[in-house]
From Swiss-Prot:
Similarity section: Belongs to the AP2/ERF transcription factor family. ERF subfamily.
Compartmental location: Nucleus
Species this protein is from: Arabidopsis thaliana
Key words, A-Z: Activator, DNA-binding, Ethylene signaling pathway, Nucleus, Transcription, Transcription regulation
Function (record text): Probably acts as a transcriptional activator. Binds to the GCC-box pathogenesis-related promoter element. May be involved in the regulation of gene expression by stress factors and by components of stress signal transduction pathways.
Protein name: Ethylene-responsive transcription factor ERF061
Record carries keyword Membrane: no
UniProt-recorded Gene Ontology molecular function terms: DNA-binding transcription factor activity; transcription cis-regulatory region binding
Gene symbol of the encoding locus: ERF061
PANTHER family hit by this protein: ETHYLENE-RESPONSIVE TRANSCRIPTION FACTOR ERF061
DNA-binding region: 135-192
Length: 335
């Protein structure tokens, strides 16, 4: 006993002093976990010598990093992870060093038994995994297992049925062929880089593939012809309606079509010796009674008016001026 006490004092007396000094510093400084910080200061050699001296007969346990609080949190996180990832096939846990596949399966069963929601989520996920299939554009499945190919016309968005097929790939190929016929290079295809359709469709006989192509081409051709006929009928109806409206407007206003000679109304003013001629008409100066006469604008009414229109006064032709009356002007100047 005395020898063992001497060995302990000789080997660990300096280490204990170091631990005391570091412990006071750690407590004053503070940190996430005091125990982890304390034992992290020891070197691996000192820890190994201590374990071999005190536990010579017992084998050392597997090393675990962190304190008991950390391990507890790790277990809780692992449990939550397994509950959220409730699927049919077991997956390795987050920390594979402490758990094996047998423990993960047991934890999954416990989570399913503890919460019905987890069991329902596991069943739903398993159903999604087993029933997940590839979806194609323009293809839908009947409830009895057959596959239907459909496409919409770019003109009026009308749905066209392309046929019923045994496989989804055959229906997708029918849609691709119809889409290329309608839209050309702008079509969105299920198999844009397909070279040999027989390999994809699984048709050993080429006659089936040819029959599929002919059926789709005939369907698209007939639909396009029907759309053209409907457009032609609509255009004919529109033209007939426009012509009928034009005829009715012409019949309601016949005066537009009739042409009459253009005449001008002139008013003359008659007096004893002179006349006042204007394009607006003839008017009597003595009686001041207007007399309306319809006379063509190109031919003068009388010879006197023609002579009067030719009168030249000081080099200016004043025949068409409304105030032209030479006798009245001289009378005014004399007075």
């Amino acid at each position: 006993m005395e020898e063992s006490n001497d060995i302990f004092q000789n080997n660990f007396s300096p280490k204990i002093s170091e631990i005391r000094a570091s412990l006071s510093q750690i407590i004053l400084a503070g940190g996430p976990n005091t125990l982890d910080s304390i034992f992290s200061l020891l070197t691996p050699s000192s820890v190994e010598s201590a374990t071999t001296s005190f536990n010579t007969h017992n084998p050392p346990p597997p090393p675990q990093l962190g304190s008991s609080v950390y391990l507890r949190q790790r277990d809780i996180i692992e449990k939550f992870h397994l509950q959220n990832r409730a699927i049919s096939t077991p997956h390795p846990p987050l920390f594979s060093s402490t758990y094996d596949h047998h423990q993960t399966s047991e934890l999954m069963l416990q989570a399913a038994a503890g919460s019905p929601a987890a069991a329902f989520a596991a069943a739903l996920a398993a159903g999604r995994v087993t029933k997940k299939k590839k979806l194609y554009r323009g293809v839908r499945q009947r409830h009895w297992g057959k596959w239907v190919a459909e496409i919409r016309l770019p003109q009026n968005r009308m749905r066209v049925w392309l046929g019923t097929y045994d496989t989804a790939e055959a229906a997708a190929y029918a849609y691709d062929r119809a889409a290329y016929k309608l839209r050309g290079e702008y079509a969105r295809l299920n198999f844009p880089n397909l070279k040999d359709p027989s390999e994809l469709l699984g048709l050993g006989d080429s006659s089936k593939l040819i029959a599929l192509k002919n059926a789709v081409d005939g369907k698209i051709q007939s639909i396009c012809q029907r759309v053209r006929k409907e457009r032609a009928k609509k255009s004919v109806k529109v033209s007939k309606n426009s012509s009928a409206t034009a005829d009715s407007s012409c019949l309601s206003s016949p005066e537009i079509l009739s042409s009459s000679p253009v005449t001008t109304t002139t008013t003359a003013v008659t007096s004893e010796d002179s006349y006042w001629v204007s394009p607006m008409g003839l008017c009597n100066s003595e009686n001041s009674s207007p007399v309306s006469v319809s006379v063509p604008s190109e031919v003068p009414a009388t010879a006197e008016e023609e002579a009067m229109m030719g009168v030249d006064t000081d080099g200016f032709l004043l025949a068409r001026m409304p105030s032209f009356d030479p006798e009245l002007i001289w009378e005014v100047l004399a007075n």
